[in-house]
Amino acid sequence: MSKGKLSERISHFNIVEELKSKGLYAYFRPIQSKQDTEVMIDGKRVLMFGSNSYLGLTIDPRIIEAAQDALSKYGTGCAGSRFLNGTLDIHIELEHKLSQLVGKEASILFSTGFQSNLGPISCLMGRNDYILLDERDHASIIDGSRLSFSKVIKYGHNDMDDLRAKLSRLPSESAKLIVTDGIFSMEGDIVNLPEMVKIADEYDAALMVDDAHSLGVIGEHGAGTASHFGLTDKVDLIMGTFSKSLASLGGFVAGDADVIDYLKHNARSVMFSASMTPASVASTLKALEIMISEPEHMENLWKNTNYAKQQLLESGFDLGATESPILPIFIRNNEKTFWVTKMLQDDGVFVNPVVSPAVPSEESLIRFSLMATHTFDQIDEAVEKMVRVFKQAEIESLI
């Protein structure tokens, strides 16, 4: 691409300036405090209902102390990839404990959750293979599929009939991989895993579940979607992240030992990326210990989720088919979604706007996410303010 063509392409990207000119830009908002149920923005108190810290562990003093201890012992970074000089004993310890949690033989760490999908999908599948994706799968799954050069086929969201129909048309001798979110990050619903494993068995397809938003939320001890349904043995690969329930940064993939060994020596996002920092690993280890040994965190998360969902539904909000602490509040208009987000922040409530192309414009929404550490009073305050702002915006469900 010539320099002129690149400049021309960039010149057409004007949505940011349009939103800023209207005072509606809602991204890259700088937070001046710890990621808690209340944060400071522009020196003002704001209720945080946009965080993925489902268990509220990012401010747990035990986790902070574990990170500080790791900094003192190992330093700030590993200065290399896992493949070469960047493997610490605590990396291996964390992999072992994650394998135990999700019920798989082995696991491999990645430096980010995004890389945890990018590496495995791109190296396990090839040009003559087929990858089947839910149309609402995460961007990292889509990008990993593109990098594999496989033939990518999307099926309707959580539509098992469509998945079966798409698989039925593929050559029986070809390699096939189904990749799905466990809990979908925008809609908050859970994959129909029982039906999916039947279809995967029927068509000899491998199955990978992205548990980024499921780990610490569902399943025994927070082990995720496969555990939630009692189908661990039927899922070939389980992916998870540490930036949500586990209060850190990074990710992993777990599966059979031979598959994980293959990934260690072929997944580029392991071989050519610096490994997780010592502080991140230690934080994850301590958060994992707390998640398993203190079930009250998950219990509180679900108490808050059920309470907030009840309050929102009784107030007339459209929540779609959510089954999780991710409560999508549908507005179904891009500009109104930005307006509501801005007005809520001005009124002391932080939520995340989700608009096209992340979702179709007629399904635009704000994502209202619960934490175990929210109080009912905080939820009540947020709902009261949302009712007022939605009525000002003339959102149809609340008029």
From Swiss-Prot:
GO molecular function terms attached to this record: pyridoxal phosphate binding; serine C-palmitoyltransferase activity
EC numbers for this chain: 2.3.1.50
Modified residues (N6-(pyridoxal phosphate)lysine): 244
Pfam family for this entry, one: Aminotran_1_2
Cofactor: pyridoxal 5'-phosphate
Keywords, in A-Z order: Acyltransferase, Cytoplasm, Lipid metabolism, Pyridoxal phosphate, Transferase
Protein family according to the UniProt entry: Belongs to the class-II pyridoxal-phosphate-dependent aminotransferase family.
Quaternary assembly: Homodimer.
Protein name (database record): Serine palmitoyltransferase
Source organism of this protein record: Sphingobacterium spiritivorum (Flavobacterium spiritivorum)
